[in-house]
């Protein structure tokens, strides 16, 4: 979460009159994040999150994202619930931006998750996949292989400025993926961005999932692979087998992976690492410092890609 657009108190108070959230008592911007402007609201009826959607989120996608959050919440997934205005709408306009109020979730994101936390994430991810299976709306993954290629075409000529030899490495990865990317595996709604800053905990118990603005339809096992990348590597880029084993066991306790999904996990993990490396690389090379987008060093995902290239079996991730 972050703040890129300021909101005047009077303007916010008038906006809130359209919602059943009581009177504004106080509000403050939330500094963390990369995509939208977020504020914590305290009102006479409780606490809420206000999100203003910046340019990277397409307004046409908002009904999918918000509808999914409502669907999952109604299915028992602990995630924010959009607040409906008095006129029945969910999406409003504030400070010239599409704006939504969502319920507040208790908990904190973790900087140093343990294996116990990873097991909780695995269970929650599987529960999300099952709960989303009958969601009636669909959204293609804009950051699947075709989307990766567009990013790579824009960044390739300068890739070796970041890491010597990177262009040749990624070219070889693309050749492999475009021939051998897994097809026909179980698929449906995935979160696609379940990083530690998008998961809240109260102690060792997971209390909520947030930030569904990359959610889409894709392979369930690809979502698992993304979580392996996000949760199971240490600061020195080493893979923590104990965390990997815990995350995968947690997932399989709710939704067992098929044999085909297990066999595909090394390639899916490498592809997921490439996807996040590419978005970071593109921003690193094309976004000016001080702009609306928070730039992240692509190096850690280059290291993950190299790790996954050497993996021969999902058992090396801790899969029983």
From Swiss-Prot:
Pathway: Amino-acid biosynthesis; L-threonine biosynthesis; L-threonine from L-aspartate: step 4/5. GO terms for molecular function: ATP binding; homoserine kinase activity. Disulfide bonds: none annotated. Its EC number is 2.7.1.39. It holds the Pfam family APH. InterPro entries: Aminoglycoside_PTrfase, Homoserine_kinase_II, Kinase-like_dom_sf, Pseudomonas-type_ThrB. It comes from the Bacteria. The keyword Kinase applies. Keywords: Amino-acid biosynthesis, ATP-binding, Kinase, Nucleotide-binding, Threonine biosynthesis, Transferase. Signal peptide: none annotated. Belongs to the pseudomonas-type ThrB family. HAMAP family: Homoser_kinase_2 (MF_00301). This is Homoserine kinase. It comes from Mesorhizobium japonicum (strain LMG 29417 / CECT 9101 / MAFF 303099). The lineage of its organism: Bacteria, Pseudomonadati, Pseudomonadota, Alphaproteobacteria, Hyphomicrobiales. The gene is thrB.
């Amino acid at each position: 979460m972050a703040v890129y657009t300021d909101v005047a108190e009077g303007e916010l108070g008038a906006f809130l009159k359209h919602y059943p959230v009581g009177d504004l008592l106080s509000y403050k911007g939330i500094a963390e994040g990369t995509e939208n402007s977020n504020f914590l609201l305290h009102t006479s009826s409780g606490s809420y999150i206000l999100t203003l959607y910046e340019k990277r989120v397409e307004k046409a996608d908002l009904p999918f994202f918000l509808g999914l959050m409502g669907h999952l919440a109604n299915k028992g997934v602990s995630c924010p619930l959009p607040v409906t205005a008095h006129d029945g709408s969910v999406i409003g306009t504030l400070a010239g931006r599409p704006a939504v109020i969502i319920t507040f979730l208790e908990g904190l994101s973790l900087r140093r998750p343990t294996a116990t936390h990873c097991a909780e994430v695995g269970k929650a991810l599987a529960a999300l996949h099952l709960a989303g299976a009958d969601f009636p709306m669909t959204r293609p993954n804009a950051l699947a292989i075709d989307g990766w290629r567009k990013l790579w075409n824009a960044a390739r000529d300068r890739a070796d400025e970041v890491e010597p030899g990177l262009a040749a490495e990624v070219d070889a990865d693309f050749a492999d993926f475009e021939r051998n990317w897994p097809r026909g595996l179980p698929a449906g709604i995935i979160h696609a961005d379940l990083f530690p800053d998008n998961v809240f905990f109260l102690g060792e118990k997971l209390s909520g999932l947030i930030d569904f603005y990359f959610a889409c339809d894709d392979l369930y096992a690809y979502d698992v692979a993304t979580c392996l990348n996000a949760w199971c590597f240490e600061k020195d880029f080493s893979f923590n087998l104990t965390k990997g084993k815990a995350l995968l066991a947690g997932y399989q306790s709710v939704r067992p992976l098929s044999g085909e999904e297990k066999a595909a996990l090394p390639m899916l993990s490498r592809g997921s690492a490439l996807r996040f490396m590419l978005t970071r690389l593109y921003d690193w090379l094309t976004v000016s410092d001080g702009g609306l987008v928070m730039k992240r060093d692509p190096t850690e995902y280059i290291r993950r890609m190299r790790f996954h290239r050497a993996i021969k079996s999902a058992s090396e991730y801790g899969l029983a």
